[in-house]
């Protein structure tokens, strides 16, 4: 398991692969302006998405032969944000979408649940998001099975 966070003091990407996994996960999803940076050692970390929203390159660097990514891009065809938090979240979503689009091209399979209408701060629709994620994963199974068959044919899987 690896978690990607951003050193808020230097702007550098940090990949956590050992140590306190709970702190690493907390740091990797600590959205700036919404959650406090997480102190690990003598450094402070925030959401890894600030510098690398999808981290396909990190997965490859750490040995992944196959990368399955999930596109949770937001739809911007909704009403304008009404408050400070909504505005911050929309700005983060826009940055995420632009940077993630580059990484999606490097993934082997991209699962695309239709959750763009659910805001990243809208926890009331989590069940809907989970169900849509399951539907999209099932839809992606033919592509995943194709990769599995190829790996078996190459002798890389039993």
What would you call each of these model-derived segments?
Residues 1-158:
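Patatin-like phospholipase
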């Amino acid at each position: 398991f690896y978690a990607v966070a951003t050193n808020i003091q230097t702007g550098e990407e940090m990949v956590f692969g050992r140590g306190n996994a709970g702190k690493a996960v907390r740091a990797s999803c600590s959205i700036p302006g919404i959650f406090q940076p997480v102190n690990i050692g003598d450094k402070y970390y925030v959401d890894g998405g600030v510098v690398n929203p999808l981290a396909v390159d990190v997965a490859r660097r750490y040995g992944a032969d196959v990368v399955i990514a999930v596109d949770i891009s937001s739809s911007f065809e909704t009403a304008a944000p009404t408050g400070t938090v909504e505005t911050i979240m929309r700005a983060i979503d826009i940055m995420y979408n632009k940077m993630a689009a580059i990484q999606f091209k490097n993934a082997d399979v991209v699962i695309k649940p239709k959750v763009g209408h659910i805001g990243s701060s809208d926890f009331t629709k989590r069940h809907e998001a989970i169900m849509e994620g399951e539907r999209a994963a099932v839809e992606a199974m033919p592509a995943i099975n194709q990769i599995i068959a190829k790996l078996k044919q190459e002798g890389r899987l039993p």
